[in-house]
């Protein structure tokens, strides 16, 4: 979340920067809340000082043998008033904090202003889309013909936007995840991590899914007096980043680099009618996530590095893609700067998102109280957090099926995956 102090001292400038990403900050309401907070703060401090002074006089009066019953009653009355003001102040601070928790991150100055994805900037492009001398099929037709993608069974078992994979396509899907993890751990310096698929509310608050995006989650257990509710993770970013929640990291341990392959679960609220065909938008999907925890001065360079790590997967698989710098109006809630990787899908004759790599700066760290000890003054300071897909496994499978298809409907296995496929070079 944004620094509440910054909201108070730089309210107009903050509102202007947030407006560039289509968010209207109610400055009048916040100003009113701040004035009330100041007033309550003064009243609370004055009542506290008065009670302390009078309490001190009780001991002096007792030493003189005086009756202190009237003073005791006065202290009790002041205590009641003080408790009431403290409760009022706490309620107000909660309201201010809720606004801060529901306000998106400030865009970095290097992010182009724009209203939506049409104003994103292409940074670079790799590979040349293949020219086919036969009619191109989409991944759904290819996968069903091969007997590897079974949507009908998934609908029967669960419902729409789920998949059953079989045989060599299931193996290819597994091979992709293994290849990605090996690349990131052996060449890019990430620590492979196994994490829970269920997380509590504090974790979702820490990474920014709550309170604003609760409808996008699959909630499995409601909150009770015994404990917090549990929800399925929408991305491994949540458990990986929360590894440093309420922690002071030694500067010598930075950067921290985590990767995990997990199933991810999203309700896709608001996406009705979009990408209803095939694997592009599923309620359950596999993803290899990359997370970096770094010092503030290192985070922008870390974003470039993390993005290149995700790009390397596409390059080794021989999949054409382009790298897009998102404009202010298209960035995610917690991001300060984001690159999207878009892979070429010949059946759609367009590039589609396959990875999103973001620098959150201290937005998540402030929520999580994730800190490191600054060597300059030996005091705890907020870390910066970054995350990205390296990659979405299902969408990578889609890209391979479409880009490596042959005229007879078979699929050529990319060279880098042969060892993960037991030497299989052709599916079909």
Swiss-Prot record:
Check the record and name the SUPFAM superfamilies matching this protein.
Class II aaRS and biotin synthetases (SSF55681), tRNA-binding arm (SSF46589)
Q: Which InterPro entries match?
A: aa-tRNA-synt_IIb, aa-tRNA-synth_II, aa-tRNA-synth_II/BPL/LPL, Ser-tRNA-ligase_type_1, Ser-tRNA-synth_1_N, SerRS_1_N_sf, SerRS_core, tRNA-bd_arm
Q: Where in the cell is it found?
A: Cytoplasm
Task: Please list the GO terms describing molecular function.
Answer: ATP binding; serine-tRNA ligase activity
Q: Which Gene3D superfamilies match?
A: Bira Bifunctional Protein, Domain 2, Serine-tRNA synthetase, tRNA binding domain
User: Catalyses which reaction?
Assistant: tRNA(Ser) + L-serine + ATP = L-seryl-tRNA(Ser) + AMP + diphosphate + H(+); tRNA(Sec) + L-serine + ATP = L-seryl-tRNA(Sec) + AMP + diphosphate + H(+)
Q: What does this protein's UniProt record list under function?
A: Catalyzes the attachment of serine to tRNA(Ser). Is also able to aminoacylate tRNA(Sec) with serine, to form the misacylated tRNA L-seryl-tRNA(Sec), which will be further converted into selenocysteinyl-tRNA(Sec).
The name under which this protein is listed is: Serine--tRNA ligase
Q: Which organism is it from?
A: Shewanella denitrificans (strain OS217 / ATCC BAA-1090 / DSM 15013)
